[in-house]
Amino acid sequence: MKRFTPLFIMAMPFFLAGCENNATVYHQYRTVSPQGWEREDTLSFVLPDSTFTEHCYQLEIGLRHTENYAYRDLWIAIIRPHSVPPACDTLHLELADRKGKWHGEGNSSTLYQFHAPAGKITLSHADTLVQLVHLMASPCLKGITDAGIRLSLTGSVNTQKDK
């Protein structure tokens, strides 16, 4: 029994780590064209319909961009065209402060990753598609490399997970 106790104590953290509650149920990015994100370019995310119906989720928007992005913010529309009635929300993302220091994570010369909560949404059986469109005055945004969404069970968003 004395041999078993130290072994059990050493193994306990591994057992507990396996019990972590991962609340993320969907997390995907779409790559933006290297020529830029055109206003007409809709980034679409098809949700597996059997998993997400009639639940409330925290929606999070993720962006990856370079220093070539010319603005400190980004306006986007979050569209759920199959929702009844169709839903469209506008979101303002502040990517840099007034002095030009980028928010989010990244190194100083290549790629930055930014996450922002976009509110709670309840998905119905018809909600199988979420779309992102930029609403900036410029018809083509250079420097945005990827945009994505994350759906998590409400009350437990972990923006550090699954980078």
Where are the language model's segments positioned?
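Post-signal-peptide N-terminal segment of Sec-exported extracytoplasmic proteins
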Residues: 39-71
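Bacterial N-terminal signal peptides that target proteins for export
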Residues: 1-8
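C-terminal motif of bacterial Sec signal peptides marking the signal peptidase cleavage site
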Residues: 15-18
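Bacterial signal peptide processing site
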Residues: 20-23
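Exposed low-complexity, polar/acidic, P/S/T/G-rich flexible segments that act as propeptides
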Residues: 77-81, 137-163
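Short beta-strand-plus-loop segments that form exposed binding edges in beta-rich domains
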Residues: 62-65, 131-138
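An anionic, turn-rich surface loop/hairpin at beta-sheet edges
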Residues: 91-122
